[in-house]
Amino acid sequence: MKKSFFLFTLVFLLGCSDSKDDLSREIDTVILDDLIQHSNEFDKRVYSFDNGLHLAVGYGIANSIMVEGIDGNIIIDASDSVAEAEEVYSHFSKINSNPIKAIIYTHNHGDHTFGAAYYYNLDEEKPMVIAHESTSEYVERIMGILNPIISKRSSRMFGTELPSGDVINVGIGPYLGVSQSPIGYIKPNITFTDELKINIAGVDIELYHAPGETNDQLFVWLPKHRALMPGDNIYRTFPNLYTIRGTPHRDVKSWVKSLDHMRSLKPDYLLPSHTKPLEGEEVLETLTIYRDAIQFVHDQTIRLMNKGHSPDEISHMIQLPPEVSSSPFVREFYGTVRWSVKSIFNGYLGWFDGNVSNLDPLPSEDYARRLAILSGGEEKLFEALQKAVESEDMQWALRLSDSLLALNYKIDSTKKLRQEAIQYIGDRALNPNKRNYFLSSANELNANYQAEPLLPQTSELLSEISIDMFFDILSVRLNPEKAKGIKQRVCFEFDSGNIKTITLRNQIAEVSSEKTNCDILVKTSEQILKEALAGVRNPIMTVASGDIDTGGQRTNFLNFLSKFAE
C-alpha cells in the first residue's frame, strides 16, 4: 500500500531527454527539409502590436497572449507549466507590469492551463479565471479514468522520452515542456454557456463558445481592436480533426461553424494559440481556406461512406483540391487527411466498417497461426519478415512482426526487426506526430528501456480537482480477481458534508451518495483522501495517524484499498 495510485501521470510528462542513446540513423535530411523549415514557425519571440496586444511564441508548445488594459492586463492561455509562464511573463512585464486582472482559458488542454497559478499568485488581489462552463470537467478528464493510456500515448506523440535531437518539432510548437516545473492549474471562477461580454480593465471582451479541436473551445474577440484569438481552432498546419494520442470524437461540422462565426467578424488581427500571428487581408483569406479544407474532408468522407466505401478505402481516396492544398496552413505537420477520414467515419457510424469479415474477426493469435501455416511454418514467416526489412518494405514488416509476436516466435529477434522497421518509418516521417510516435515506440523496444519516472503531484493541484473524479478512477481501477465473491460497502463521510459510498459486488464498484448499511465508515477531509490516493501522503501512515478515521477498522480499510491496486 505504500505505492501511489498514480492518478495523474499525464500532468507530469517529462520533457525531451539528452541522456538516452540517439535513435536516429543517418538518413538523407533532404527528406525532412520541410519539417525542419517548419520549426521557424516557433522562433522564440514576443510579437507586439501598437494596440496593446502581445503574443509570446516559442516558449513552449502553446502561445500565451497579453492584452494591455487601463489599470491591469489580461492573459489569454497561461502556458503549460509554472516555469514556462514565469519565463513568458518576464518578457510581458517589461512591456507592461500592471497587475493581471484576468486569465482566460481558450480550452482545457494543459499547455493552455497548467501555468495559470504563476499569474494567479503574482498579486494579493486574485485575477478572474474565465473559461467555458465545461472546461473544468474536461481538465479533470485529462487526469481521470483514461489518464494512464492517454499519458502514454501523449508521451509517444510528443516524443517526451526521446533524445532532444530526435524531436524536430511537434507540429504546433517546438516541444512539449510539461516536466520539471510544478503544475499550476487554477479552476475557473467565471464561466459561461454560449457567450460572455465583459469589460476588464477598460477592455471590451467578447467570448464565444466555439466547439472545434475541443468541445469546450472558445474564441476571444476584441471588437475595438478588431482582434481575434481563436484558441486551437486554427494554426499553421492541417488541424487535428483526430489526434493519435486518443480523444473523444471531434465534431467537424461544428468546427466549420465556429470558423464561420470568426469569419463573420472580419478580424484585422489573428493571434492563434499556436504558430505565428497574422494581420490584414491574410486573416480572412486564411480562415476561409482553413474552413474549406475541413469541410471538404468532412463532406467527401460522407459522400464516399454513402457509396459503401470503408474507412481505409476512403482514407486513400480523398485529397485536398490544389487551390486548398497550396496553402501553408493545411500542410500536414499536425493532423492528416487520412487520420481525419477514419475519425469522421467512426464518429458517424462507429467502429464497424460494414465488412462482415471484421464484425467478429479471428483473434490475432489464431490469425497469425493460420498465416504461418500458409507461409510454410513459423520460420518461413520469420524469413519473410527478414526479407521485408532487408528490402525496406517496412509497413509489411510491421504486419508480419505483429503475427510473429502473437505466436511468441523468436521474440527477441522479431522485436529487433520490428524496431528497425518502426525506426526506419519514423526517421522519414514528415508529420511530427507520426515521427515522434514511431521513434518513441522504437525506443520502448530497447532491452534496457524504462519509462521515465513520474514527478510528484502537489497538494495545490489536488485541491483544484473534484473528489468525484477520484471515485470515478477507483471504479475503473478495481481488480476483478481481487474482488471475486466480495460484497462490501465502504462509506466516506467528509467534513465538507459530502458523502461517497463504494459498494463492491459482482466484481464491480458502484459509487453512490447513500450512507446506509456501511461495513466501514470512513471520516476524513476530501483533501486528505485525495492526497492519500494520489501518493502525496502515505496511505498506511495516514490511516495509522487517524487523519483517515476508519472507526477501528484500519486493516479492513487497507485491504479494501488493495483491491484497487494491480
Regions found by a protein language model. Give the residues of each.
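C-terminal motif of bacterial Sec signal peptides marking the signal peptidase cleavage site
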Residues: 13-15
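Active-site metal-binding motif and surrounding structural segment of the metallo-beta-lactamase
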Residues: 41, 46, 71-72, 83-130, ...
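Active-site neighborhood of phospho(di)ester-bond hydrolases with catalytic His/Asp-centered motifs
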Residues: 76-78, 99-109, 130-133, 229-231, ...
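Accessory terminal helices/loops
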Residues: 20-36, 147-154, 160-167, 172-173, ...
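Feature captures hydrophobic
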Residues: 387, 393-399, 403-406, 410, ...
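Metallo-beta-lactamase
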Residues: 48, 73, 80-82, 137-209, 254-266, ...
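Conserved beta-strand hairpin/beta-sheet module of binuclear metal-dependent hydrolase folds
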Residues: 43-96, 219-232
